[in-house]
Each structure stands twice: as structure tokens, then as C-alpha cells.
Amino acid sequence: LGPNVFLKNMKIGARSEIKAGTYAEDSTVGTEVKLGPYAHLRPESEVGNHTKIGNFVELKKAKIGEHTAISHLSYVGDAEVGSRVNIGCGFITCNFDGRVINGQRKHKTTIEDDVFVGSDCQAVAPVTFKKGSFIASGSTITEDVEADSLAIARARQVNKSGYAKKLKNEQ
């Protein structure tokens, strides 16, 4: 255990490393897991064996498979993530639909085995990334991604020559 770690009602497997500033409660961590620094496991999260939950990653009601890496700066809530998944920096599961009908409405994201998620992606739940799929960096995924498919969901870049100068002069 690193310094300034807070653990409450946790089950932690053998040879797991919990680094500085990590906060975890009412969750389960497998064997040989690396948590943190500054990871946050909210209640009802499960982390599989040989998995990395890195710095500034927050899990909420998330089940994470074995040999998976969520290395930094991500929010994974109301999600099931398979084994051998790599999730890039800045990934967010968008799980709340903004409506309150008989309480908050949360939706599930499912990421099956062997998926690669590039940096700065969002999963707008409910959505499933099927086995072996590849999510391109910068994508906002709103529909299911079929197995072994590449999903690219971002607008094409448009450069407007001279426009920056015009904007600066309007100040």
C-alpha cells in the first residue's frame, strides 16, 4: 500500500499494488492488480486479475475483466469491460441520460474481450463494443460496434484560412 490510501470494505487479491492517493470502497480487486496512483473505485466495482487501473481513473459499478488496462484519466461507470481490453487516456462512459423519471436514469456500456479504445473517446450508453473491435481516437460512439470492426465517429477537420486573424481582431 502506498501513502494516503483509503480503503473501506474491500476485498483485495494477493500481490496487488495500491498506489498513493487511491480511494476505494465496497469493491473487489483481483490478484496482481495495479491501482493508482489516485484511482477511485466507487461501490460495486470489480477488477479482474492482472489488470491495471491507473492514475485518475474512476470506476463506478464497473466490472473489469482480466489483463485489461485503463491506464489514466478515465471515467468508467455502469459498465462491463471484458478481458484483454486496452482503454486509452481520456475515455468516458456517458451513462446518465439527463432525465429524472422515478430517480436517475443510468445506462450500461458493454465492452467485450480484445477491444482497443483509443484516447479521448466517449461511449454514449446504452452501447456495446463487440469482441475485437477497434475504436479510433477522438470518437464519440452512439451505436453498437460490430465484432472486429473499426469505428470512427468524429467530424472531419476543416481549416479556414485567415479566420483566426479575423476572430482575434473582433475582440
Features from the language model and the residues they span:
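Glycine-rich hexapeptide-repeat left-handed beta-helix
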Residues: 17-171
